[in-house]
């Protein structure tokens, strides 16, 4: 990798840091509104440090002439998440008086929209800290795509390359130029956040709670302003609004753009969307009926509670209404399986994504047909289009390394001393970016604060690998990547 490319990457990272520093003004204003100026200095100092480092990278970074190759984009993508997390953790250290390990874990959980937390006492926590956590989700949800696509074209870098390295969306392009798509997506993201906040406010939350949860839910993140998560609010309207926002955040944003550009039935016609919604509704009905039979809840209450928790896990959001691990072994195993599903490709959700299951099903059907008709030429199709061999290779490679990554992280957590339930569910929830795990320690009613520091760093790596879909990060450790 050339020195000019590294300097250009440093320049772009500097712009990211400057943007991060400026965004810290929002929690500062929040603190002033709530008359909590005692925490103001923490964000002020963190902002100054971040801004200074950003300026240094910008001034020293950009060479006279340079272009990033596609391979350089992988370093930029991974580097941006790590560098931003490094500085975004500073306010948490200063306000919450926690170790940098805990602060980095919380920040990586926020930026990757995982939602696992080491903090408690959220109901009385600093409003500046709460809004900052929600902002990390919100910024992570969009993946800094809007900013990156606005900046990279100025540097003569194709913005769609960053789309490809941060997202598994391989659907057709909905706009001729990536920066046009980015503009639409940012407007949609802002609009959905605003609509969600207003709806939650109307349903019974305070404006501050509504804004925090709108940012957390649309990004499928999961941070809340209460230790009890959504269980803190008993109004059914709040729960149903949350379900809708989580689903909206889990649908392909490119199809929203297509809808706005005149393709009115783009979402409805998409096989991935239909499969995702169908899977959710079927799971709601099945598990809701099961909970009604095995509890004292009315059917409507059981259906609502299940809808929130199932949608939360499937969309990798991580909010909860009650502790579903207390429902029995069937529920525990079911929610563990649901951890892997994920939302739609091209959304803010994590996990394996629905389209991979659908492509695998299409491959199974074609293989069975081939067994019946050995000499027939059977074309593999998905969503009406032939499945390219590169897509199949990518799916198989990703699925293999996805499984291996979870297994290795779980083994590492067990080696550190965690019980097998905490180790396995912790690894799965980190790589799938879900949030809560299973068991009494990291389940919906617990948090990650009691874990050893080594376990937190290992889970942090898992969050990053999962968010960037593993291969984007793993390519950096191959010798051939650095050879030329």
Regions from the language model: what does each represent?
Residues 1-484:
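Membrane-proximal intracellular helices of multi-pass ion channels
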